[in-house]
Amino acid sequence: MKFENFNILATAGYTPERVVPNSELTTMMTTSDEWIVQRTGIHQRHVVTAERTSDLCTRVAQQLLQRSGLQATDIDYIVVATMSPDYQTPAVSAQVQGNIGATKAVALDVNAACSGFVYGLQVVHRLLMGDSPKTALLIGGETLSRLVDWQDRSTAVLFGDGAGGVVLTSALAQDGAFIAADYRTMGEQGRYLTAGANGVDSPFASDPQPVLPFFKMNGRRVYNFAIKQVPASLRRVLDQGHLAVTDVDYFILHQANQRIIERIAEDLTGSMAQFPVNIGQYGNTAAASEPLLLNQLVTSHVIKRGDVLALSGFGGGLTIGTMILRY
């Protein structure tokens, strides 16, 4: 199989300073540290106090430029995956572009909820295809604490804020390569995970609707979706790439819930050895979760050049996206 050049030049991650441990949540709702850890694997989460999604993403973009040795004017594209933008418009990517002075970069946002970063990988992969080498920043960033009802323990215990990203290029900079990808949307199940309903309050509305800003989730439906669809998607990309499970060095999964990841690992390999996790530190950060984990593994020298990585995101939409690449 001929692999296409798809190189990660640098990784970066940022989380707000404010940490909310489970013990603090017990003062806000009827719950306990034991209850949260047993059901989710989460011990704490980071939350913003004044920062916005664009601020988190800008910090990541600045780190990416520093670590890659690139100038802002070297960037051709900026793609931000988020479900918690500052505004309906401008896009977070446009705000980042302006903040870092990437004057020639085309900027766009992707909203595929918790699948957003992996959807963004496919968008960037397509953007970079062409005759001349191009370079892009791909960032997943979220301030989900703004979408949480902090009295609803079914959702409040899950989510955190943060951002992570990568510099991607089609130049022959490293040994990186795109291997295979699989993307699916099950819109008929979208009602099982919603957030940020805008409402309808126009004077011309025949049926005014209230604003519903907070997460609403059918946890059982989402759990069953994940443990069924993620292994199926991973098997499809392995087949496309003519790879065995043992050919993958690490499976970088959306950090939705420790129990979900354990079930997926048991299904695919029978072991957590290839499935690193950091949900205990950060909670579910939606589109930020995979790049935050990837950055941790790269900066701690766990992931090395030439490693084969399978990234999979899943969540609202309902959506799932999986890509295998060589780092």
Swiss-Prot record:
The record ties this protein, via Gene3D superfamilies, to: 3.40.47.10
Query: Which one GO biological process term can you cite for this protein?
Result: fatty acid biosynthetic process
Gene responsible for this protein: fabH
The free-text domain remark for this protein reads: The last Arg residue of the ACP-binding site is essential for the weak association between ACP/AcpP and FabH.
Residue positions of the active site: C114, H254, N284
InterPro entries documented for this protein? ACP_syn_III_C (IPR013747), ACP_syn_III_N (IPR013751), FabH (IPR004655), Thiolase-like (IPR016039)
- One function term, GO molecular function aspect: beta-ketoacyl-acyl-carrier-protein synthase III activity
SUPFAM superfamilies, A to Z? Thiolase-like
Q: In which pathway does it act?
A: Lipid metabolism; fatty acid biosynthesis
Q: Family membership, please give it.
A: Belongs to the thiolase-like superfamily. FabH family.
| HAMAP family the UniProt entry points to | FabH
Assembly with partners or alone: Homodimer.
This enzyme catalyses: malonyl-[ACP] + acetyl-CoA + H(+) = 3-oxobutanoyl-[ACP] + CO2 + CoA
Per UniProt, the enzyme's principal EC class comes to transferase
> What do the Gene Ontology cellular component annotations say?
cytoplasm
Alphabetically sorted, this entry's keywords are: Acyltransferase, Cytoplasm, Fatty acid biosynthesis, Fatty acid metabolism, Lipid biosynthesis, Lipid metabolism, Multifunctional enzyme, Transferase
By what name is this protein known? Beta-ketoacyl-[acyl-carrier-protein] synthase III
Q: What is its EC number?
A: 2.3.1.180
Q: Where in the cell is it found?
A: Cytoplasm
Give the protein's biological function.
Catalyzes the condensation reaction of fatty acid synthesis by the addition to an acyl acceptor of two carbons from malonyl-ACP. Catalyzes the first condensation reaction which initiates fatty acid synthesis and may therefore play a role in governing the total rate of fatty acid production. Possesses both acetoacetyl-ACP synthase and acetyl transacylase activities. Its substrate specificity determines the biosynthesis of branched-chain and/or straight-chain of fatty acids.
Where are the residues of the annotated region ACP-binding? Answer: 255-259
Query: Is-annotated flag, keyword DNA damage?
Result: no
